[in-house]
C-alpha cells in the first residue's frame, strides 16, 4: 500500500469569545473603568497604569482594554497584592464619594445636544474644538453636580487619523472602533434587549441602537445606526463625523435632533432646558413641536412652549460652518412633518429662511435654530457681536446692536487640561476650596507666593518631557513614512531642549493663518538660527479631507521644515488628538494663535495652555480679546490696517517677527545667576493670576445658568402652568396682533417745522406726537423715535432710541408723545418704529413685527 505524504480533513472551527474573568477582589476596577471619571482624575489613571505599565501603554491608556488583556495569572496575582488592593480601595472610595452626591435640585435640568464630544482620546467621537468644548462641558456638569444629559452619536470610524507622506501630503485613515473595548454600555429596554430607536425618514424608518457613556455623574447617550436592521444606505449615518455628502449630513442632523428627542422620550427623560450646541441639533425642536401639537396644543401654542425652553449656541462666523439644504433634498426626508405640526410645507421652509417666501432660498439649520430658540449666544464677547450682525437679517426691523443674541465665553475643564505637575503646584499652594471655587481670582493670586524656581522648574520639566516625546514619536513616524534613517539622526540632534519652544496646533482652516509665520522666510531663518536666542516652532493639526487649501498649508509647512536652515527648528507633529494636545499645551513655552480677525469664535486651546503656565501670543480675537492683560502675554493689535488680506498678513507677520526679536526672546534669555529669567516667571505668574480664573469651564457653566438656563426654565414653567394657560394666552395675543397689524393706522402726526425740514440744533428738545388707531388691540402697540448715524469706521449704527409715551386714549385712538434731542452735531437719520408690546415676551425679537413710518 502506498502511504500518502499527508492526510487531514478540514477543521470545523467554532468561533469563541474569551472574556476576561475579573476576580471579585478587583471588581471595583471594572466599575471605575466603565466611567470616564478616570479620564480627568490622575489618581485613577495612575492606579490603572500601576497594574501593568507596559500593557497600559500597549492598550492605548484604555482601562477597559487593559483589564481585557491582563492574563488570568496576572489578575490572580493582583488580587493577592495588598498594596494594589489598598490603593484601589482608596481610589474607589473617592470615586464612590463623588458619585453618590445627588444632583443640585435648585438648578434647572438640561438636555445637551451636540454632534461630537471630546472626552478622552480613547473614545473617538470628536474632531476638534466643538467636540472638546462639549466634552469639557459634560465633565464640568458632573463636577458641578448638575442634572444634565448629553445626546450625540457613537461613530464607527469617528474622525480620521492623520498621517503624512514624506512630501507632507496629508493621508486620512479611518480606523473602525471596537465598541466592545470602549468605556461605554449598551442601553437595554424593559425586556433586557438592546434598546432601538425608530426614527421616521418620510417613507421608512432608520433604526438606531443606544449606548451610554458615564461621564462621572452625567450620562451621555449615543445613537448608532451601524446595524443589520438598516439598509446599506443608512448604516453609514453614524460611520464618520462630518463625512459623506450633503444627503448624509441631513440624515445625521435628523437623527441627532429628531432621533435624539425620540430617544430621550423612550428613556423617560424630560428636562427643563434643551440646549442645541450648534445648528446640527436644531431639528430636535421639530420633534418637540410635533409632540406638543399631537398632545392637543395648536402650532402657535406649541411654539411658545418649545421656544421658551430652547437655547442655541453658535460656534462660528465662517459660512462653511452653517448648513444649508436644497428644498428638494430637505423635502425628501422632512416632507411628512408639517402635517404633524399643523402647518404647511412652505411655513416649515420659511422657518429656515432669512427671507420667508423666497422659494429660491435654501433651508438653513442656523436660521431654524434662531427661529425656534428663545435665546441665542456666541462663544466670546466679540463672537457674540459678530453673531448679532450675522443673524440680523432674521429679525428685520431691528439693528444688530439691538439684538437679543448674547454670549458666554468658552472655558476649559481644569482637571482635564492641567498637567499633574501643575496640579501638584496648585494643590500645595492654593486654598483647599480651589477645585470648587475655580473662578475666585484671590485663590489664583496665591501663585505669586510660589517661588520663582518652582515655577521655572515645573515649566522646564514639562518641556523636557515634551521634547523626549517628540524625539521618540518623530523618529517613529519618519521611519514609518520611509524617510532616510541617516537624516532623522541629524534632525533629532538639532532639537534643543533648552530653546524657547512655541506651539501652534489647531484645525488647519485657511482663516487660522498657519502660513503667517512663513511670510518672510529669510527673516524667520535668522530668528531660528540666532545662536544667542535659540527658538523652535511646533506645529500640529488636521485639515478636513475636502479642504484642499488647508491640506496645502500642512504640506507647505512640512516642506519648509525639511530645508537645512529649518531642520529641527520647525517641526510638524502628525495626528493631532487629545493625547497630543495635552502634551503640547503643557510642554511648550508660548502658545501662538494667528487667526484672521474676527473669524476665531473663541480659540480655547490657548486657555488650556494658560492653565499650565504657558504664555499666550495671539491676535486679539475670540477669548484673547477679553483675556489679554499687559505683562501677562503678547497680542497683535485688534486694529485692521488693510482691507486687502495679503497686505494685512504681511503686516501681522512683521509684527510677530518684531515681537519675537525685540521682546519675547530677550525676555526669555535674560537669565539671572540662578539660571532662570525673572521677567519670564513674572509673566507666567501674571498670566495665571490675572487671566486663568476667568477661563475655566466652571465659570462657563455658571454663566450658562445665570444668563440662560435659569431664565428660560422660570419662563417655561410659567407658560406651561395650569394646562399651558400663559402659552395659550400669548399665542392668542400674537394671533390677534398679526391679524390686525396691517390695518393699524397712524391717524395724525404733530412735529415742529425743524423736524419736518430736518434742521435740528444740538441741545434743543423737540416734541413729537402721533395719534394711532390700534384697531382694538388695547394698548398693545409701542412707538419709538430711532436716530441713526455713522460711527468712526463709517458704519451706520443706532445713535439713540427714544420711547414714546401714551398720553391720551379715546376708544381705539392712542396718542403717543416724546421729547428728544441730539447732544452732538452731525448728520443723522430719524424714523419712527412701531412694534407690538407685551411684558410677557422675553425680548422684542420674540415677536418680530415692525413698521417704520415718518
Q: Where would I find each of the regions flagged by the language model?
A:
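Catalytic cores of carbohydrate-active enzymes across secretory and cytosolic contexts
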Residues: 1-854
Amino acid at each position: 500500500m502506498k502511504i500518502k505524504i499527508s492526510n487531514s480533513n478540514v477543521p470545523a472551527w467554532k468561533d469563541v469569545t474569551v472574556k476576561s474573568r475579573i476576580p471579585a477582589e478587583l471588581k471595583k476596577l471594572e466599575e471605575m473603568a466603565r466611567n470616564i471619571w478616570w479620564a480627568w482624575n490622575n489618581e485613577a489613571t495612575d492606579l490603572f497604569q500601576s497594574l501593568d505599565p507596559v500593557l497600559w501603554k500597549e492598550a492605548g491608556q484604555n482601562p477597559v482594554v487593559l483589564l481585557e488583556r491582563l492574563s488570568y495569572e496576572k489578575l490572580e496575582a493582583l488580587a493577592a497584592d495588598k498594596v494594589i488592593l489598598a490603593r484601589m480601595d482608596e481610589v474607589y472610595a473617592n470615586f464612590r464619594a463623588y458619585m453618590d452626591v445627588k444632583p443640585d435640585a435648585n438648578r434647572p435640568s438640561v438636555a445637551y445636544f451636540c454632534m461630537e464630544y471630546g472626552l478622552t482620546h480613547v473614545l473617538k467621537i470628536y474632531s476638534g474644538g466643538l467636540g472638546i468644548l462639549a466634552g469639557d462641558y459634560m465633565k464640568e456638569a458632573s463636577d458641578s453636580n448638575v442634572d444634565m444629559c448629553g445626546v450625540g452619536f457613537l461613530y464607527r470610524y469617528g474622525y480620521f487619523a492623520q498621517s503624512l507622506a514624506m512630501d507632507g501630503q496629508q493621508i486620512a485613515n479611518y480606523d473602525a472602533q471596537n465598541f466592545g473595548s470602549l468605556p461605554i454600555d449598551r442601553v437595554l429596554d424593559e425586556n433586557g434587549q438592546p434598546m432601538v430607536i425608530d426614527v421616521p425618514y418620510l417613507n421608512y424608518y432608520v433604526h438606531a441602537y443606544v449606548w451610554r457613556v458615564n461621564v462621572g455623574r452625567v450620562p451621555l447617550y449615543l445613537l448608532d445606526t451601524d446595524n443589520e436592521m438598516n439598509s446599506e444606505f443608512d448604516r453609514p449615518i453614524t460611520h464618520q463625523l462630518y463625512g459623506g455628502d450633503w444627503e448624509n449630513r441631513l440624515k445625521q442632523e435628523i437623527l441627532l435632533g429628531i432621533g435624539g428627542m425620540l430617544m430621550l422620550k423612550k428613556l423617560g427623560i424630560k428636562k427643563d432646558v434643551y440646549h442645541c450646541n450648534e445648528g446640527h441639533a436644531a431639528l430636535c425642536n421639530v420633534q418637540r413641536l410635533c409632540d406638543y401639537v399631537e398632545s392637543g396644543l395648536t402650532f402657535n401654542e406649541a411654539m411658545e412652549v418649545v421656544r421658551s425652553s430652547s437655547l442655541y449656541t453658535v460656534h462660528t462666523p465662517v459660512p462653511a460652518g452653517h448648513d444649508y439644504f436644497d428644498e428638494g433634498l430637505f423635502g425628501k426626508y422632512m416632507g411628512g412633518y408639517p402635517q404633524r405640526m399643523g402647518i404647511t410645507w412652505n411655513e416649515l421652509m420659511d422657518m429656515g429662511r432669512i427671507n420667508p417666501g423666497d422659494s429660491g432660498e435654501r433651508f438653513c439649520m442656523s436660521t431654524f435654530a434662531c427661529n425656534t430658540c428663545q435665546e441665542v449666544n456666541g462663544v466670546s464677547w466679540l463672537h457674540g457681536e459678530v453673531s448679532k450682525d450675522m443673524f440680523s437679517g432674521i429679525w428685520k426691523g431691528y439693528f444688530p446692536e439691538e439684538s437679543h443674541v448674547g454670549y458666554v465665553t468658552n472655558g476649559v475643564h481644569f482637571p482635564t487640561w492641567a498637567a499633574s505637575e501643575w496640579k501638584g503646584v496648585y494643590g500645595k499652594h492654593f486654598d483647599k476650596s480651589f477645585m470648587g471655587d475655580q473662578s475666585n481670582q484671590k485663590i489664583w493670586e496665591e501663585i505669586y507666593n510660589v517661588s520663582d524656581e518652582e515655577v521655572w522648574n515645573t515649566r522646564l520639566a514639562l518641556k523636557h518631557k515634551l521634547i523626549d516625546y517628540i524625539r521618540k514619536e518623530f523618529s517613529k513616524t519618519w521611519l514609518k513614512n520611509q524617510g532616510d534613517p541617516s537624516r532623522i539622526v541629524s534632525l533629532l540632534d538639532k532639537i534643543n531642549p533648552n530653546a524657547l519652544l512655541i506651539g501652534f496646533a489647531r484645525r488647519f482652516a485657511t482663516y487660522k493663518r498657519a502660513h503667517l509665520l512663513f511670510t518672510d522666510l529669510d527673516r524667520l531663518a535668522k530668528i531660528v538660527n540666532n545662536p544667542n536666542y535659540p527658538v523652535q516652532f511646533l506645529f500640529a493639526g488636521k485639515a478636513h479631507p475636502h479642504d484642499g487649501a488647508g491640506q496645502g498649508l500642512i504640506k507647505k509647512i512640512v516642506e519648509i521644515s525639511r530645508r537645512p536652515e529649518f531642520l529641527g527648528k520647525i517641526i510638524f507633529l502628525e495626528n493631532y488628538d487629545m493625547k497630543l494636545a495635552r502634551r503640547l499645551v503643557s510642554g511648550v513655552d508660548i502658545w501662538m494663535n494667528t487667526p484672521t480677525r474676527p473669524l476665531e469664535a473663541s480659540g480655547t486651546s490657548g486657555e488650556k495652555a494658560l492653565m499650565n503656565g504657558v504664555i499666550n501670543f495671539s491676535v486679539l480675537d475670540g477669548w484673547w480679546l477679553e483675556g489679554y492683560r499687559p505683562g501677562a502675554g503678547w497680542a497683535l493689535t485688534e486694529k485692521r490696517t488693510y482691507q486687502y488680506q495679503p497686505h494685512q498678513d504681511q503686516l501681522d507677520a512683521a509684527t510677530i517677527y518684531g515681537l519675537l526679536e525685540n521682546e519675547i526672546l530677550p525676555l526669555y534669555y535674560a537669565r539671572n545667576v540662578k539660571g532662570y529669567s525673572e521677567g519670564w516667571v513674572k509673566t507666567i505668574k501674571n498670566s495665571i493670576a490675572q487671566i486663568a480664573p476667568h477661563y475655566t469651564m466652571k465659570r462657563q457653566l455658571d454663566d450658562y445658568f445665570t444668563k440662560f438656563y435659569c431664565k428660560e426654565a422660570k419662563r417655561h414653567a410659567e407658560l406651561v402652568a395650569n394646562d399651558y394657560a400663559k402659552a395659550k394666552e400669548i399665542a392668542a395675543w400674537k394671533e390677534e396682533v398679526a391679524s390686525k397689524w396691517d390695518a393699524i393706522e397712524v391717524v395724525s402726526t404733530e412735529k415742529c417745522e425743524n423736524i419736518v425740514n430736518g434742521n435740528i440744533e444740538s441741545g434743543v428738545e423737540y416734541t413729537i406726537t402721533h395719534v394711532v388707531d390700534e384697531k382694538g388691540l388695547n394698548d398693545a402697540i409701542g412707538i419709538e423715535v430711532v436716530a441713526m448715524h455713522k460711527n468712526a469706521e463709517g458704519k451706520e449704527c443706532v445713535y439713540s432710541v427714544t420711547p414714546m409715551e401714551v398720553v391720551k386714549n379715546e376708544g381705539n385712538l392712542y396718542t403717543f408723545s416724546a421729547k428728544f434731542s441730539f447732544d452732538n452735531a452731525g448728520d443723522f437719520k430719524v424714523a419712527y418704529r412701531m412694534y407690538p408690546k407685551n411684558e410677557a415676551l422675553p425680548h422684542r425679537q420674540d415677536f418680530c413685527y415692525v413698521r417704520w413710518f415718518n
